[in-house]
């Protein structure tokens, strides 16, 4: 018994009806999920188009190419409409998200309190700016040092009486925490040939009993210049220019002093608010120090100066106790 033969016109009408129904459903789909369900319903393996195509075997052989062409045309049409509707829905979804996440720029912002530069750091920056303007290069070195760089290379051997002038933090491995930034000068001179002009800022450590003017950890800045023909007059001119930039037009005096790594040496005072304040030590680099780094003291001379940053900051900001710098008291820090 043979299968009944379908009429070509009947199957063609089914394809036309499917197209009209599918296009209407696609055009009214409101979500991407709904659109995907329509794709499966019409074009899936068990979809309506597949069910119609399954009937093609009952058509006369001569009608099958015609129905096949109509079916392929319908499939391409539906795929195009599905993709176009998908693009539209995606654009609408993005637009809705942007609208929901939009910011009203007229609304008041959330206040974020501003921080302040610590008075020690602002003082360091100000001092470095002055010396960089005078042609000096900023140099840095390690805070953990060897006895050689901290003492011996600076003309302070183990049996030198000046060792008793500083109480030092020694570490278990035999190294120490530097007591001054002069060690940076030695390291720099070992690496570079004259002429050199450097300014070396950094933390230093000494076994001082803490009080209003002393701290075990403090900041120091030192300068060093080495060249042919430098004299004490050049040192005085540099120091005077620096102090005038920092404090303004104030009286300055130099007093003879002693440091193991400079000869001659001097202390420098400024007259501030009616009294003399000691602000730094300085001097001509001892020839022995130049020899230690391989410089010929018959050809080169140099000068150096060093001072504590805390002392300068206390004078500039009229702070009465060095310990205020390290308490992290916002009532104090907000003043700067």
Swiss-Prot record:
PROSITE patterns the UniProt entry points to: AA_TRNA_LIGASE_II (PS50862)
Keyword tags: Aminoacyl-tRNA synthetase, ATP-binding, Cytoplasm, Ligase, Magnesium, Metal-binding, Nucleotide-binding, Protein biosynthesis
Main location as per UniProt: cytoplasm
Protein name: Phenylalanine--tRNA ligase alpha subunit
Organism: Thermosynechococcus vestitus (strain NIES-2133 / IAM M-273 / BP-1)
Location relative to the cell: Cytoplasm
Entry GO terms, CC: cytoplasm
Classification via Gene3D superfamilies: Bira Bifunctional Protein, Domain 2
Chemical reaction(s) catalysed: tRNA(Phe) + L-phenylalanine + ATP = L-phenylalanyl-tRNA(Phe) + AMP + diphosphate + H(+)
InterPro entries given in the database record: aa-tRNA-synth_II (IPR006195), aa-tRNA-synth_II/BPL/LPL (IPR045864), Phe-tRNA-synth_IIc_asu (IPR004529), Phe-tRNA_ligase_II_N (IPR004188), Phe_tRNA_ligase_alpha1_bac (IPR022911), Phenylalanyl-tRNA_Synthase (IPR002319), tRNA-bd_arm (IPR010978)
Keyword Cell membrane: no
Cofactor: Mg(2+)
GO biological process, any: phenylalanyl-tRNA aminoacylation
Gene name of the encoded protein: pheS
EC class: ligase
Similarity comment: Belongs to the class-II aminoacyl-tRNA synthetase family. Phe-tRNA synthetase alpha subunit type 1 subfamily.
Subunit structure: Tetramer of two alpha and two beta subunits.
Entry's cofactor comment: Binds 2 magnesium ions per tetramer.
UniProt EC number: 6.1.1.20
GO MF terms held by the record: ATP binding; magnesium ion binding; phenylalanine-tRNA ligase activity; tRNA binding
HAMAP family from the UniProt entry: Phe_tRNA_synth_alpha1
Claim: Nucleotide-binding is one of the keywords in the record: yes
């Amino acid at each position: 018994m043979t299968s009944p033969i379908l009429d070509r016109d009947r199957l063609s009408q089914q394809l036309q009806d499917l197209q009209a129904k599918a296009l209407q459903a696609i055009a009214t789909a409101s979500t991407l999920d709904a659109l995907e369900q329509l794709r499966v319903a019409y074009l899936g393996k068990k979809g309506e188009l597949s069910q119609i195509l399954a009937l093609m075997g009952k058509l006369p052989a001569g009608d099958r190419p015609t129905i096949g062409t109509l079916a392929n045309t319908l499939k391409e049409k539906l795929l195009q409409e599905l993709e176009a509707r998908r693009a539209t829905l995606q654009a609408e979804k993005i637009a809705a998200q942007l609208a929901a996440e939009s910011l009203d720029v007229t609304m008041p912002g959330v206040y974020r309190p501003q921080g302040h530069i610590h008075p020690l750091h602002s003082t360091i920056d100000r001092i470095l700016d002055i010396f960089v303007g005078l042609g000096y290069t900023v140099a840095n070195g390690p805070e953990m040092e060897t006895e050689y760089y901290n003492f011996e290379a600076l003309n302070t051997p183990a049996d030198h009486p000046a060792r008793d002038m500083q109480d030092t933090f020694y570490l278990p491995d035999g190294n120490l925490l530097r007591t001054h930034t002069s060690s940076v000068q030695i390291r720099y001179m070992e690496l570079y040939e004259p002429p050199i002009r450097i300014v070396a800022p950094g933390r230093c450590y000494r076994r001082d009993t803490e009080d209003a003017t002393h701290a075990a950890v403090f900041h120091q800045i030192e300068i060093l210049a080495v060249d042919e023909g430098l004299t004490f007059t050049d040192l005085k001119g540099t120091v005077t220019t620096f102090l005038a930039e920092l404090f303004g037009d104030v009286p300055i005096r130099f007093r003879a002093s002693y440091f193991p790594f400079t000869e001659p040496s001097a202390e420098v005072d400024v007259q501030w608010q009616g009294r003399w304040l000691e602000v730094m030590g300085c001097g001509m680099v001892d020839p022995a120090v130049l020899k230690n780094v391989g410089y010929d003291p018959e050809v080169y001379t140099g000068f150096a100066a060093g001072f504590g940053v805390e002392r300068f900051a206390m004078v500039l900001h009229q702070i009465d106790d060095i310990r205020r710098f390290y308490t992290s008291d916002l009532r104090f820090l907000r003043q700067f």
